[in-house]
């Protein structure tokens, strides 16, 4: 045994190396316009990189460089690429929701209106498969550390579907139905991304799921 190994084995246990903890800024804590703009730049950079190279291309240093922020600053806003991509997914759903004119949602019945919204989301997510794959992959495999971001995404999807069904304020039952439809929608989105189902297959499956859950009623 070498002297180096002997010294190591006879020495008292060394204290564990200190790990630097970065205080992460929650979105609600972004008090200044500069902070909000920086967060927007970071998410824009993330989506631009994912659009070209998918999930694997999204590396923290690459995002920091494109967003023109220090890597340490990036980690203060988003502690991992999963947080980045799930937050980007949430922002995309928020944009779709904000652009949707509720008075223009086609259909006189809950079935028709919900089908309209499901189709709208399908078309939006199928425009850029690499970006969608990156955001969806992060969402599916997110752990408890990204629970807040995942919860926000789930609430956004559920709310969009529930409000599409409702003629006014959604009921508790409509929110429950929306949650089931959200799960079915995500499952079929993954099937499309992995080429296990065509866009037509996905549309037919979701139409059937909506029909089975709420029926094709004649009344609103």
Curated annotation (Swiss-Prot):
Species in which this protein is naturally found: Mycobacterium tuberculosis (strain ATCC 25618 / H37Rv)
Complex and partners: Homodimer.
Protein's name in the database: HTH-type transcriptional repressor KstR
UniProt-listed Pfam families: TetR_C_20 (PF17925), TetR_N (PF00440)
GO molecular-function term, one example from the UniProt record: DNA binding
Gene: kstR
DNA-binding region coordinates: 59-78
Domain of life: Bacteria
Function: Controls the expression of genes used for utilizing diverse lipids as energy sources.
